[in-house]
Amino acid sequence: MSPVKEDRANLSPRSPRHVAIIMDGNGRWAKNKGKLRVFGHKAGVKSVRRAVSFAAKHNLDALTLYAFSSENWNRPDQEVTALMELFVRALDSEVKSLHKHNVRLSIIGDISRFSGRLQERIRRSEKLTANNDGLKLNIAANYGGRWDIIQGVRHLAEQVQKGELQPTDISEESLNSYICLHEQSQVDLVIRTGGEHRISNFLLWQIAYAELYFTDVLWPDFDENVFEGALNAFAQRERRFGGTTPIDATAS
């Protein structure tokens, strides 16, 4: 990360507080260059660094990145192994810089399937940055939106089984309290790179009223200009949340 400076000169005052990004296109980017897919994933790490720096510089409250879905285990073993090793190396190389710049790192998803080595890196990184109060950086790893909802439902079912909760008392609020990111500001904007127009099982609960922004730019080519363009496009949207009157939900 580069040093964080406050700079909102080129952005609308109606910028989102919480942005989530589906980082798509690493494989195609590598293929276009005649390289193996892992080459694209390595290049994508640089885009992560740029995105985090931009988010912190422009005072976003939270940035959530879709790094590895629960469906990605179906990819070739060689690619999965390379991704896991890249994850370890990225944590080792980036966490001190994140901490220096007051970023709080959280990994959301079912990390139990990861190697003990990777789980230890995750715990160590989260612990180091736990007390930081700057940008909240969430990395979704072995994450799926359906999994997230199911694990929340299971917590409620356990409460019902123990007699601590009546089924009739189950509400959106009670389920939300067990869903990932519930303690953070709601997701305002979802950006997907790579040209596909779908959500891919990402934050299904959390993005109910988020604005969606799709770009053909492949993730390794994602830079500050593309990010700024997405935020400025967001500023032109009228968010109604099911009503008829536009609501400025980004106001703190």
UniProtKB/Swiss-Prot annotation:
Residues reported to bind Mg(2+): 24, 197, 211
GO cellular component: cytosol
Residues engaged in binding substrate: 25-29, 37, 41, 69-71, 73, 75, 192, 198-200
Pfam family, one: Prenyltransf
GO biological process per UniProt: cell wall organization; peptidoglycan biosynthetic process; polyprenol biosynthetic process; regulation of cell shape
InterPro entries: UPP_synth-like, UPP_synth-like_CS, UPP_synth-like_sf
Keywords, in A-Z order: Cell shape, Cell wall biogenesis/degradation, Magnesium, Metal-binding, Peptidoglycan synthesis, Transferase
Catalytic residues, chain numbering: 24, 72
UniProt GO molecular function: ditrans,polycis-undecaprenyl-diphosphate synthase [(2E,6E)-farnesyl-diphosphate specific] activity; magnesium ion binding
Record EC number: 2.5.1.31
Enzyme class: transferase
Cofactor(s) needed for function: Mg(2+)
Record keyword Magnesium present: yes
Cofactor binding comment, as recorded: Binds 2 magnesium ions per subunit.
Domain of life: Bacteria
Keyword Cell wall biogenesis/degradation: yes
NCBIfam families documented for this protein: PRK10240.1, PRK14830.1, uppS
Role summary: Catalyzes the sequential condensation of isopentenyl diphosphate (IPP) with (2E,6E)-farnesyl diphosphate (E,E-FPP) to yield (2Z,6Z,10Z,14Z,18Z,22Z,26Z,30Z,34E,38E)-undecaprenyl diphosphate (di-trans,octa-cis-UPP). UPP is the precursor of glycosyl carrier lipid in the biosynthesis of bacterial cell wall polysaccharide components such as peptidoglycan and lipopolysaccharide.
Protein name (Swiss-Prot/TrEMBL): Ditrans,polycis-undecaprenyl-diphosphate synthase ((2E,6E)-farnesyl-diphosphate specific)
Species this chain originates from: Yersinia pestis
Lineage: Bacteria, Pseudomonadati, Pseudomonadota, Gammaproteobacteria, Enterobacterales
